[in-house]
UniProtKB/Swiss-Prot annotation:
Cofactor: Ca(2+)
GO CC annotations on file: extracellular region
The protein's name: Conodipine-M alpha chain
Compartments where located: Secreted
Recorded family membership: Belongs to the phospholipase A2 family. Group IX subfamily.
Regulation: Inhibited by linoleoyl amide and MG14.
Catalytic activity: a 1,2-diacyl-sn-glycero-3-phosphocholine + H2O = a 1-acyl-sn-glycero-3-phosphocholine + a fatty acid + H(+)
The EC number(s) this enzyme carries: 3.1.1.4
Record-listed Pyrrolidone carboxylic acid modification sites: Q1
An example molecular function term from Gene Ontology annotations: phospholipase A2 activity
Amino acid sequence: QXPSTAELCKINSNACSVPFSXIPCQKXFLAACDRHDTCYHCGKHFGFKQDDCDDAFFRDMTALCAHGTDDEGXCPX
């Protein structure tokens, strides 16, 4: 049995499209980046436009950044 498109989308999402490696708090953003990659690669199958993906990514990142950093400026755990 061939894997479904949804299963392939999960397999192929690894946030590898992050353009540079020195992003502060990169691990804290990994899930949001994975969702954005998945949306870009597979969104058409589910009826999403790239603008929808970008809007969702903006909301995800805004929510993550709202938590801020600790007193030493370190990323949230």
